[in-house]
């Protein structure tokens, strides 16, 4: 009876592992494609702004008002950005609105176009987190899809910056913010040694 029970447990683990690997592949492709579009448009916008900075910079305040209008008009909840991601990762939030993806991308593009300062890493993480969280909810992953959420965040960050290992640790750090055991960091330190 123990052998039968062990085999059932092994089959369940194998099925679960396959499901996670398939999900990672599908999400990696989708998140990578969105990141690529985001990054390419951002590079184009940066070049365009550099060539026309004197004309565009005076309109930065109006661009800011336009971004506020976009969030208020389409999805005010999405304005919380990374807070939504952290709350979802900690199980405090049921969903992240999909509208966050186009809004955060458009807001960053507009900001950069008119000479404002906005980071890319937060956008990449939010793209990955939002898409992966929606996927996990749709397919009813265990633990509210926390593993899938972390993988999606890492895919977003790693896809934009081409740093997969750093992305994994960054995503884990964001989700557990403040609750990661310091002893675990000692275990991971050896992974960074070859890069120095």
In which residue ranges do the predicted regions lie?
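Alpha-helical transmembrane segments and immediately membrane-proximal extracytoplasmic
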Residues: 1-196
